[in-house]
């Protein structure tokens, strides 16, 4: 739906597990801040009609969120971004075109709110996505690729996600890919009658930490292979049973890779961590879970190794989705309402309506006082038109500097607070002003985590 307004035009491009294979998502994935900054800078350099931009890259999706300059053609922006992606990732534009989902304006806002609320996730209700979006926004904001427009959008998205979690039961069951993987591992453990409840975990990022917590919850012991011993020491302080977890440097991978029946791998490496040249024959069967995108485990050549990728877990997720249909429906109602409220709030913060309302308030006040003066015969009736002109010129002169200042600050980060304060001071649309006043946008929720 195209809005007939000068409000910011929101725009999203999405490649997800629903539309794109794991192999293609691997090519799109960005796993380092340096690469992400370079990609965002390329967009900034080659897409002058994109005002602000951020990228969300996870194991299940690659998405670009942007605000466009007024009058920008959305199809032209899509084509430009697909061309940049194709060149950057050595893919064809036609392949990307087949998989991309574009949203603009209200549908873009609804999409961002749905993603943040985990309604578009492989595991509906998983809470990891909100944190990933906060990190993506934080990076783009701090590197100055986004400002007021996306801050407004993401701040409201975080509020919407919190409301969905609080008002529905959508996050009460299995809540992440990691929990589904551990649940499947437990089923394998019981079916295979494995003696020792032990697992090898490669990585110590957010996904790996979730795996470890789920393993401990199921009474497993875990050996972690990573690069940062200090990070491990900080992590185990969060655990109820830290003695069930041990750490070795990942350089010792060869010494452990053939010793465990259960293995979970989740690192940000763009290359295979576990390679076939490391493998030896074992008398026991092995079950490996590769939760990384790009994948960290080379497809095993040994017959007794069973490898599960992120996409392989999808059938195990379907039951999770079916169990949450009622919660999903309620959640989508909340997202729909939040989308409407977002645009109402944005419109309440626009500078032009405030300037118009201020001038109208001045005109009404002047006219009211003039009529009082005429009624009490302080001035003759025949002078009414001349006095109206004098008053009109007077309040125009009075409001000239504030008008210039408001227009000058319209695109600055503090404009929302400024407009909210003016509306509150002059009682202009008081309900909306109070709402704006309660939202301190530049202390965004990501600072709380």
Swiss-Prot record:
Provide the E.C. number(s) assigned to this enzyme: 1.2.1.70
Function statement: Catalyzes the NADPH-dependent reduction of glutamyl-tRNA(Glu) to glutamate 1-semialdehyde (GSA).
Instruction: Supply the name of the protein.
Output: Glutamyl-tRNA reductase
What do we know about how this protein assembles, alone or with others?
Answer: Homodimer.
Which Gene Ontology terms describe the biological processes this protein takes part in?
Answer: protoporphyrinogen IX biosynthetic process
Q: Which residues form the active site?
A: 59 (nucleophile)
- Which InterPro entries would you find in this protein's record? 4pyrrol_synth_GluRdtase, 4pyrrol_synth_GluRdtase_dimer, 4pyrrol_synth_GluRdtase_N, GluRdtase_CS, GluRdtase_dimer_dom_sf, GluRdtase_N_sf, NAD(P)-bd_dom_sf, Shikm_DH/Glu-tRNA_Rdtase
Species per Swiss-Prot/TrEMBL record = Helicobacter pylori (strain ATCC 700392 / 26695)
The residues that the entry says bind substrate are: 58-61, 121, 126-128, 132
Pfam families this protein is in? GlutR_dimer (PF00745), GlutR_N (PF05201), Shikimate_DH (PF01488)
**Entry's family note:** Belongs to the glutamyl-tRNA reductase family.
